[in-house]
Amino acid sequence: MSIVTIIGSGMMGAAMARPASDNGHHVRLAGSPLDNFIIDALKAGKDHPTLKRSFAGVSGEFYSADELEPALKGADVVVAGISSFGVDWFADHVLPLLAPGTLVVSITKGLRLEADDSLQIFPRYFASRRPDVDFAAVGGPCICFELFDRRQTMVCYCGEKMEAVRKARSVFATSYYHIMCSDDAVGVECSAALKNAYAMGVSLAVGLAEREKGIADARGITENCIPGAPDLNPVYNPQAALFAQSCLEMRRFVELMGGNGNFVAGLPGAGDLYVTVFGGRTRRLGTLLGRGMTYSQVREALSGVTLEAAAIITRAAEFLRRAQKSGKADPKLFPLMMHMDSILNAESPAAPDWDAFGGF
């Protein structure tokens, strides 16, 4: 039995407790500074406030953000379950507390734009802060509710040390949670990060179709973006076109970063993009922008919602502009990415240039 400490008790971090507990490991679920209301509820024996599930069947304890030291003491595996906006907090406050040789499994999706104009995946950033700690990361389609409910799920674990990746798989793999392994951390992590960005792009078509029905504000956006909710205007050719363009640009981007572009056709890319478009905060973001709202209006309508897609798009587009100056990339090969950046950062209306899409 291992001690598995999960830092970040939001929905995905909390869901990871299920396979770890089912495998007989002792789980410690610890909150970030934003998670106190979750930890307070769980300590009181209540359901998880956002996952809407009981933890009665999960073996372990709950810790608040000011209880990191006892939560991490003796931990064999630590899950980085924070959002991309919490990466520096994790590096500053959690990594220094880890014993050498601890295995960190990151489920955080995103990319860092560095001062030298490079993009860095989070596991490499963490490793630069603690080279004596082992790191693995997770990519692939995994809806938190379904994992917690033991639905059949297949993902990809990656890392630059296959021994660490296989150890992570041994801790979490179950009869319902199936794990592929890869040493191409760049290919997997870039695909996993970019699918968040491009899920917004595909969702623009949802909002554009709803605009045809006269829906141009945030009415019903939460209910309409729950996975399985019917589309208000079921038009799918535009969504399919944007999905295909997303996969094309993701492959180009992953290869530009030095990863294997084939991952885009697999679990970390197209697989994860598929479920992300079905519902959740990124679908809400893209749908509202497609309805004709500006990004400023959308941020107000979705106040309190973490919009990781916006951060990834902004960083990726800026990376492409900087890479163009050095002759390493051509933003014209990423028309959907650059259009999404214009929508977010120049308040441009959602109006995809369909004739700019396509190619191989």
Model-flagged regions — what are they?
Residues M1-S54, G60-S64, L72, H93, ...:
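NAD(P)+-binding Rossmann beta1-loop-alpha1 motif at the extreme N-terminus of oxidoreductases
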Residues G8, G31, S106-T108, G139, ...:
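Short beta-strand/turn micro-motifs composed of small residues
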Residues G10, A14, N36, F62-A65, ...:
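Electropositive phosphate-/nucleotide-binding environments in soluble metabolic enzymes
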Residues F62, L68-Q152, A168-S170:
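Rossmann-like NAD(P)(H) cofactor-binding subdomain of soluble oxidoreductases
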Residues L97, S128-D134, Q152-N262:
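Internal alpha-helical scaffold of NAD(P)-dependent oxidoreductase catalytic cores
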Residues S106, D134-G139, I179-D183, A265, ...:
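General beta-strand structural signal in soluble alpha/beta enzymes
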Residues K195, M200-V206, E210, D217-P234, ...:
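NAD(P)-dependent Rossmann-like dehydrogenase/reductase catalytic/cofactor-binding core
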